[in-house]
Amino acid sequence: DVDNKVNQRDDFHHVNQVIANTLHEFQWVFIGAYPLSLTPYVQSGQIEFHPWQRLYEYPEQLYKLNPTVLIAPLQDNIFNRAKSDLKYIEACCYGIPVICQDICTYENAPYRFTTGDELIDQIRAVTKSYSKYNKISKEGREVAETRWLELDQNIDKYAELYKHPYKSPERKNINSLEENQ
């Protein structure tokens, strides 16, 4: 969106109210865009906002912001069900716990929510203890390293993804991962 705002029925629509209600408890930060309904909070400085960055600048920006948790809300619709779980994988690579919408896009994410209240409960659960938080961060990083990063042991998995259609019996490496979950 040209003005860095997203429309009224955005992916945050079902969590906007709990974000507004928890401004006293959490520091909310948006990168790239923010929901129109939260504009007064952005303008007053109650919600921190950072404009879009070039793709290669994004990891450094995220590092400097040092987020505690990332969230990935999505409306449950055909378009979003067809998306990849890139936000989950990205957060795992950074070692940042991520709480994702409970739709098929994020079926591999261990922390998911359906409602805004569930999102807040999940944030509290992830951040309530330093040792639990570190364990979650480490587990996410291990997911990234063992399943997604371009390591030698993953090259065959990537080749299968490009050569064979979804659920094909020829996808031996990928299918074995799904069976072991």
Q: How does the language model describe each region?
A:
Residues 61-64, 122-126, 143, 161:
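CheY-like receiver
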Residues 15-18, 87, 158:
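Short amphipathic alpha-helix
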Residues 168-181:
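Non-catalytic membrane-proximal stalk/linker segments that position and tether the catalytic domains
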Residues 128-167:
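A charged, aromatic-enriched C-terminal amphipathic alpha-helix characteristic of glycosyltransferases
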Residues 6-10, 56, 60-90, 100-110:
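Nucleotide-sugar-dependent
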Residues 1-65:
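Conserved catalytic-core segment of nucleotide-activated headgroup transferases in glycan assembly
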